[in-house]
Regions:
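Residues at the C-termini of beta-strands that transition into short coil/loop
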Residues: 46-48, 97, 116, 244
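Conserved beta-strand hairpin/beta-sheet module of binuclear metal-dependent hydrolase folds
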Residues: 29-85, 184-200
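Short beta-turn/strand-loop junction motif enriched in small, turn-promoting residues
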Residues: 48-50, 99, 169
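Active-site HxH/HxHxD metal-binding segment of metal-dependent hydrolases
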Residues: 5-6, 74-163, 200, 253-268
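Accessory terminal helices/loops
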Residues: 1-29, 225-300
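Flexible, glycine-rich phosphate/dinucleotide-binding loops
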Residues: 51, 121, 249
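Metallo-beta-lactamase
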Residues: 18-40, 67-69, 75, 111-175, 178, 188, ...
Length: 300
């Protein structure tokens, strides 16, 4: 099965990255940083939870007059201190989506942005223990866990831009994984920061995530529609840096993901059994290097 080959590549990556030279921080031993090979002003921060599927990336993009931090991870350890050691520019945070492994450290920052459709989900998750999504495969003390906060989060929409000085970051709304799921295009490098939408691990469009607001956007069909809508723009990107798995993926992943959504919509019952993570639904579709794990009630 092709998806098993791809997940073996992911497991190999998870082992290899632990051996690579990285910037480490006394103030937060949970995070390692790597400079992008094309642009040292893009810094990738890696939180290794000991589980190759759950380890998460945050991305710091630095311009001449400002910086943008994409996601804040699980909220374990002092992330603000890490960012302060990497840039002296004023920092804004943009959450690619509301899930707890991407928003856990938000309370450490003042200027936080999120797509308007995900803000209600994020607010609801603050009062739900399961919404915190703390890793279960990593040893850490409760003292290291950053308290959540309902401080004001600014709403964004498709096409909004962040001007950092010498580079512009453009928001691309890409629903499916969440109602307000987004990606970000960097004008200087052509890198697409693809969040949990397009990555080297499976994209999840499953009923394990709530569908209270804008339920029609938590579907494979909505994902496909957004890919088609933005394909002219996405075809111009050069590389993909997702929130999980390998970085600097070829832009072929974009068209492969569109084809994967097409195949699911044509024949939703044509799937393979996915047993990599027992707690997840077992239906997976794989087209080239693109993978989607889905449930039948999230097709349309």
């Amino acid at each position: 099965m092709r998806w098993k080959e791809l997940m073996q590549q992911q497991d190999d990556f998870a082992v290899e990255i632990r051996k690579q030279d990285a910037i480490k921080f006394a103030s937060n031993p949970f995070i390692k940083a790597f400079c992008n090979r094309l642009d040292p002003n893009i810094i990738h921060l890696y939180f290794d939870d000991g589980n190759s599927g759950g380890s998460v990336w945050m991305h710091l993009i630095c311009g001449e007059c400002g910086a943008l931090l994409l996601d804040t991870g699980y909220g374990i350890g002092n992330l603000k201190s890490v960012i302060g050691q990497l840039t002296d520019k004023p920092v804004s945070v943009f959450n690619t989506h509301w899930h707890g492994d991407h928003t856990g450290g938000n309370s450490q920052f003042e200027n936080v942005y999120m797509h308007e459709f995900d803000i209600p989900y994020w607010k609801e998750s603050l009062s739900c223990e399961a919404g915190r999504m703390l890793p279960t495969t990593l040893a850490f003390s409760q003292d290291a866990v950053i308290p959540l906060s309902d401080k004001f989060v600014r709403a964004v929409h498709d096409g909004m831009t962040f001007h950092l000085g010498g580079r512009i970051e453009t928001i691309v709304h890409m629903p499916g994984h969440s109602a307000g799921n987004c990606m970000v295009i960097d004008s200087k490098t052509g890198i697409l920061f693809s969040g949990d939408a397009i990555l080297s691990t499976p994209t999840l469009v499953i009923d394990g995530f709530p569908a209270v607001d804008h339920a029609e956007l938590l579907t494979v069909e909505a994902f496909h529609t957004a890919l088609v809508q933005h394909m002219k723009q996405l075809n111009k990107v050069k590389w993909l840096c997702p929130s999980h798995g390998r970085l600097m993926l070829s832009n072929k992943y974009v068209s492969a993901m569109q084809h994967c959504t097409e195949e699911i919509l044509k024949a939703p019952d044509k799937w393979e059994r996915y047993d990599y993570i027992p707690s997840l639904p077992s239906m997976i579709r794989c087209v080239d290097d693109a993978m989607i794990v889905y449930t039948l009630n999230r097709i349309h």
